[in-house]
Amino acid sequence: MAEEDIQPIVCDNGTGMVKAGFAGDDAPRAVFPSIVGRPRHTGVMVGMGQKDAYVGDEAQSKRGILTLKYPIEHGIVNNWDDMEKIWHHTFYNELRVAPEEHPVLLTEAPMNPKANREKMTQIMFETFNCPAMYVAIQAVLSLYASGRTTGIVLDSGDGVSHTVPIYEGFTLPHAILRLDLAGRDLTDNLMKILTERGYSFTTTAEREIVRDIKEKLAYVALDYEQELDTARSSSSIEKSYELPDGQVITIGAERFRCPEVLFQPSFIGMEAPGIHEATYNSIMKCDVDIRKDLYGNVVLSGGSTMFPGIGDRMSKEITALAPGSMKIKVVAPPERKYSVWIGGSILASLSTFQQMWISKAEYDESGPGIVHMKCF
């Protein structure tokens, strides 16, 4: 097989979802939950060909008989056996490729511990025998996907949010802020406020329903107090949602109360800055000369930035914090749910990137530490 025919694989491992596909494509081929499920009661059904572990959608659909585990918490891998299962499933079942034939680009959370990057590298070369691999920082890929090399990325997924300032393609590690507030917390918050309305959602299965309600109906208010007044005085913002059993529920103020937590974490008892303030704090930790470039390029990325109205609200809030004359631009690309993956697809297919891969030979010579020399 000629060198040119080999498409690199791009795999973005998020806390909630794995996004995987081939470099050069404009969207991931496989998107599935980052879950590994193991049977709670083994050996009940002899001869049923029960597997010892299920991954992704299959684990989700059989969740009644399984114990579900998320190997990635707050963006960082903490269970390598399960993570290996997820990668195995990605290559062999979802993409149906032999990993020993393709270079693999993986993504990592900002400030991922050094030992973790080494472990990822080791698994790719030793377990999957990849010919080459690379580890890229998620936020940087999102910035590339938006066609920029300088800006500040607010990346908010299911398990963690980060504000990452990037200048000429390099992250500024001292100014990165992590906020353990993301999609899962918003879903939990919506479960709680729906309970106040008299609807009860408690199990993990019901959490998935609430997540769907959140994704379909929630939005960010430009002015929270004013929106509350509107909600009290009229039914204009009420929407109905049909549950799987056919029951129809109505939700009003909950629609914008749910994601308001991103701006006011105190709503769920968190002592943390909102995403607007974290973005501002991140910018203020950077050199005074580059702040103007960051204010003018605030890029939203990740599934938890998909709420309608979030861009305008971010713009309003950052404008209120920034110096008066500062020009502020918040960019919310329509494909931002997958922009990390898309950035990886762009990067891995660049001709200039081809000398950046860590090859199997380099790994064999230097060991896992090679990742710190070649991946920034």
UniProtKB/Swiss-Prot annotation:
Reactions performed catalytically: ATP + H2O = ADP + phosphate + H(+)
Record's keyword annotation contains Nucleotide-binding: yes
Record PROSITE patterns: ACTINS_1 (PS00406), ACTINS_2 (PS00432), ACTINS_ACT_LIKE (PS01132)
Coiled-coil positions: none
GO terms for cellular component: cytoplasm; cytoskeleton
Pfam entry (one): Actin
InterPro entries referenced in this protein's UniProt entry, alphabetically: Actin, Actin/actin-like_CS, Actin_CS, ATPase_NBD
Highest taxon, organism lineage: Eukaryota
Task of the protein: Actins are highly conserved proteins that are involved in various types of cell motility and are ubiquitously expressed in all eukaryotic cells. Essential component of cell cytoskeleton; plays an important role in cytoplasmic streaming, cell shape determination, cell division, organelle movement and extension growth.
The protein, known as: Actin-7
Organism expressing this protein natively: Oryza sativa subsp. japonica
